[in-house]
């Protein structure tokens, strides 16, 4: 995506698919939890301006840029509905998260919640990975080992099978990729 060169196209596309379903005129009012996909840019801008004018938090456009981040991004509500500008803003937020979290999962969590260690952010990360066709499979057998077998060394002597290596197979999509390690100066309002 030429609009968002700091982020791998597959990663950015997965974020967009999760955030807006690829619809450029989506307005999500975080206060009322109501999301609307408008038929035109003008209608989306008018709705978002009204919501922001009431002091409510709203996510806008393809990458669902939050209204609280507009000042730091130097954007107006109207500008954020330009698809390329919206993608560039989303990429800046994601790259800034990557610079802080130093992992794609942490960056995605920060993109969604402002924190790299959030349970909600972790669930969001899995959804974005799923949009890109990446799924981490379950460990074969599907049961957790008892903690004493993992911690107490003497149990290995009495149960050599407990020491057998577990091979975890991760099957990523051939189209999935991470972020380019580009640092960005932008810090969303929720990270301060």
State what each model feature region is:
Residues 1-138:
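Catalytic glycan-binding domains that act on GlcNAc-containing polysaccharides
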Residues 1-5, 133-192:
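N-terminal secretory targeting signals
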């Amino acid at each position: 995506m030429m609009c968002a060169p700091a982020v791998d196209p597959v990663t950015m596309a997965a974020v967009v698919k999760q955030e807006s379903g690829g619809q450029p005129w989506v307005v999500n009012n975080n206060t009322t939890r109501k999301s609307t996909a408008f038929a035109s840019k003008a209608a989306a801008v008018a709705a978002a301006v009204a919501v922001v004018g009431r002091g409510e938090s709203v996510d806008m456009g393809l990458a669902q840029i939050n209204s609280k981040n507009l000042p730091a991004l130097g954007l107006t509500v109207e500008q954020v509905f330009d698809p390329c500008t919206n993608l560039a803003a989303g990429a800046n937020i994601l790259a800034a998260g990557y610079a802080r979290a130093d992992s794609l999962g942490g960056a995605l969590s920060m993109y969604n919640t402002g924190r790299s260690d959030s349970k909600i952010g972790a669930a969001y990360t899995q959804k974005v990975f799923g949009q890109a066709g990446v799924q981490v499979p379950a460990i074969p057998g599907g049961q957790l080992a008892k903690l004493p077998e993992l911690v107490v060394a003497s149990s290995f002597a009495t149960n050599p099978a407990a020491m057998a290596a577990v091979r975890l197979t991760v099957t990523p999509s051939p189209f999935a990729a991470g972020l380019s390690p580009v640092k960005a100066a932008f810090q969303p309002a929720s990270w301060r």
